[in-house]
């Protein structure tokens, strides 16, 4: 009886990712943008100017609060308040905005990758995310990254 029970649990856990979770399953929806970006990086790498970047700012309450404020005014419209990619501004985007909250917890994401993503936006991937390198100071981008690591 225990073997059958455990067999059903294992089978179910293997089957659920295939089914997805509604319209936003693992192979479509919010996670898809993260996978598209990851595939692009695996094929092309990222701009060498970003590869070795490391956040120079201290991870403290002041920088987290500043990053949160910047995120809320510049990112939350599309990525949602909690970073799930469910903001009203991103509902009709194809591909939809990335689920940052899940992505940042699933991977050991280097600072340079996050900086590149925010600075260059969707330009390398021809998506709707605007580049922020010309409208934000470096320190502002770093503060957003500090906040994202708290999601």
Language-model segments: residues:
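Short cysteine/histidine-rich zinc-coordinating motifs and their immediately flanking basic loops
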Residues: 88-92
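Positively charged n-region of N-terminal signal peptides that target proteins for export
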Residues: 1-4
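Short amphipathic alpha-helical interaction/hinge segments
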Residues: 83-86, 126
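Bacterial N-terminal signal peptides
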Residues: 9-17
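Sequence/structural segment immediately N-terminal to covalent heme-attachment motifs in c-type
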Residues: 61-84, 114
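Extracytoplasmic electron-transfer domains, predominantly the class I c-type cytochrome c fold
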Residues: 94-151
């Amino acid at each position: 009886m225990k073997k059958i029970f455990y067999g059903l649990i294992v089978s179910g856990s293997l089957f659920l990712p295939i089914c997805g979770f509604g319209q936003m399953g693992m192979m479509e929806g919010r996670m898809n943008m993260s996978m598209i970006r990851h595939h692009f990086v695996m094929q092309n790498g990222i701009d060498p100017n970003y590869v070795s970047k490391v956040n120079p700012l201290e991870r403290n309450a002041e920088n987290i609060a500043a990053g949160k404020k910047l995120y809320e005014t510049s990112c939350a419209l599309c990525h949602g308040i909690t970073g799930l990619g469910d903001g009203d501004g991103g509902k009709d985007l194809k591909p939809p905005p990335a689920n940052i909250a899940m992505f940042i917890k699933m991977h050991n994401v280097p600072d340079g990758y996050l900086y590149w993503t925010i600075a260059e936006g969707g330009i390398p991937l021809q998506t709707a995310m605007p580049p922020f390198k010309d409208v934000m100071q470096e320190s502002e981008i770093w503060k957003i990254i500090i906040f994202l690591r708290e999601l």
